[in-house]
């Protein structure tokens, strides 16, 4: 037995060593095949400002709504629907969906309007690389960036700022390019998606000095699917918006309108998210952006490349009929959706009224009744009503980093005019026997956006000197009367046109200078009130 023990011990040690070797090989193979990087799903990032990004706001029911899709057949160029609705009837596919691709490939297309000579574009699986967009971060508080130049806030797009995925074998024109930014090194096989010839045809510069949306499209590269890597995804439909004159209400309304039209033309089932592809600081007007859409975010707030499952490129506000109508005659008048549904008319529109209702509904304000404050004058005269007369004031406020805090006066004796109106109403010397007046001091700059819209909604008559604040009349109710006081230096048609396109009654008082005679204003208001039945 003693001679056999060493032999048995050797066999035992050999078997133990062999088993240990097998265990080492197994665990090494297992750890390499199931690494944490491969077992974890890709990170999905949702655009949001409130950690509720999965929630998309539904479209509200609007009395003036008319169908947007499909667009009208044989829509005449220059029709009211062409200007204000879905005139984007020519579809151009720059990258078609891959047949049998399982829905993971990219596509990119634009819808062109012959009337507006602009395009609404959309794409699937569009990758944005923030490091390839040169601009300030955006979204800062105003006081943090005082003195910053506007050029720093507007985007400059490097090649490949946006990318789509395409099979290299499917198209000619691919070349190997260096990739800069986005934490990527080396090179990638890519091609320019939209050439200059196509840009000139479908995204004309027109009179716009810096057409940032055209520049964005020009930056898009189609890369091989193997080079299209996305760690972060935005699953909800997202509008990409670049704003000019972002602190001015009139120009911001053109941006809101363009974003609304883009959402409707592309048939979005719910309200989209918005990504600002600019570097502007925050303003009070973002209250309305947030109310209108499902969420807002700034492009530079993304710290790494991000992919949008469905992105829509909203045309610049300068390309809307609201702006283009200032320099050219748009022969359209406002009408009710009910009338247009029964009797279509290429020279009439309800789209501006629909948009105004959208703003009111976004703030939770009623859209099915005209006003809330037409009430009996007293218990003894129950048939008489009180009408709100809103005097929209211009007041000093700090608008943007290059602003000194002083607004340019359009009516040098505005305070005197308002005080005279107030005294006229307060002393009961209006001479109106069938109704009363509630004069509202419209210091809008110091009101929330919701309260501003509510004041417009509740007004029967809106008075004001020419100024951006009057743009709120897009949200006015039917039968509202607009009374604009126009100084000799500001003979511009902005608000006369909006009133016309909404079908509102409009009166203008043209001044010989910048001073209005209070008695003349009172006489004109008396005339307007009598036309209301007072």
Curated annotation (Swiss-Prot):
- Enumerate the Gene Ontology biological process terms: post-translational protein targeting to membrane, translocation; protein N-linked glycosylation; shoot system development
Remarks, miscellaneous: Renders plant glycoproteins immunogenic and allergenic in human. This is due to the presence of beta-1,2-xylose and/or core alpha-1,3-fucose which are not found in mammalian proteins, and which constitute epitopes for carbohydrate-reactive antibodies.
Q: What is this protein called?
A: Beta-1,2-xylosyltransferase
Q: How is it modified after translation?
A: Glycosylation at least at one of the two sites Asn-51 and Asn-301 is necessary for enzyme stability and activity.
* Keywords assigned: Glycoprotein, Glycosyltransferase, Golgi apparatus, Membrane, Signal-anchor, Transferase, Transmembrane, Transmembrane helix
Against InterPro entries, the record matches this protein to: Glyco_transf_61_cat, Glycosyltransferase_61
Q: Does the keyword Transmembrane helix apply?
A: yes
> Which chain regions cross the lipid bilayer?
12-34
What Pfam families does the annotation carry? Glyco_transf_61
Q: Which GO terms describe its cellular component?
A: Golgi apparatus; Golgi medial cisterna; Golgi membrane; Golgi trans cisterna
- What Enzyme Commission number does this protein have? 2.4.2.38
Sites where a glycan is attached: 51, 301, 479
